[in-house]
Amino acid sequence: MGLCKCPKRLVTNQFCFEHRVNVCEHCMVQSHPKCIVQSYLQWLRDSDYISNCNLCGTSLEQGECVRLVCYHVFHWDCLNARQAALPANTAPRGHQCPGCSVEIFPNTNLVSPVADALKNYLAQVNWGRNGLGLALLSEDQSSSLKAIKSKASVSQAAVSNMTKVHHIHSGGERERGKPNGGDASTPHSVLLMDAFNPPSSGDFNASSRRPLLPRQSPIGGTDRDDNKYQRRTPAALLSRWTRRFYSPSSRPPWRRTWFLVLSGILAFVMFIYLLAWMGRSGSNDGLDESWNNPNPQPNHYE
């Protein structure tokens, strides 16, 4: 079990073999759509992986990929062609993962970002809609979906190419403007938004509540995951304990105030007790012993 490093901070046992980090299902869909993800125990047994599609043998980076509920990744075109070649009367349980023979169609009561993304792909083809219990698409509708999908992929590729050209061109202008005593244009940033997947109101609300910079505790440090098993020296433990007094904390302020007050009272009582003990030990000198002796011995002088 591990903690995902995304803002959701979910506990997960899935591990990305390529980036070597714990990932939750939200990160699988958003940040690791083409990565090899399996359990952390599987990675401990064998960390070797091949980032190729098991159906065609080519790299997963060369096409659109889909992740099944068993977390295996395939090219969508390869998986669609394989499952479409099955008979039309194939039961939903007959559509299985080529790698582990797990049913492709997720359960209806499964709440999972990976399952939701898979359902979006399955809803585009008739064999997928048949397994999901949806109405079948006509030939015109399926052809229009394919045309829209191809246009979307072409436009996204063109936007990415234009972005690269723009960065190269702007970088060249800045390099030419430096010898003349300053930059030719002021630095700026370009915000590209997907025209086919506009952000919803929920995304705006979520982004408005997200802090600009993640708050890092100065006590644990930035390399908390790297040295969490390192042996702490007494100096490091003392420094960590003293830094808690001025570090920002999520606890109520009255707890810290009461802790300081009780610590001061305890220190004052210990100081008074120490002074009293030292006073009693200093009063037991030889003069007091002679006056309190019941059988004094007189001194004889010759």
Swiss-Prot record:
Its main location: membrane. PROSITE patterns: ZF_RING_2 (PS50089). One of its GO terms (cellular component) is Golgi apparatus. GO terms for molecular function: zinc ion binding. It is found in: Membrane. A zinc finger (RING-type) spans 53-101. The modification Phosphoserine is found at S217. InterPro entries: ZFPL1, Znf_RING, Znf_RING/FYVE/PHD. A zinc finger (B box-type) spans 1-43. This is Zinc finger protein-like 1 homolog.
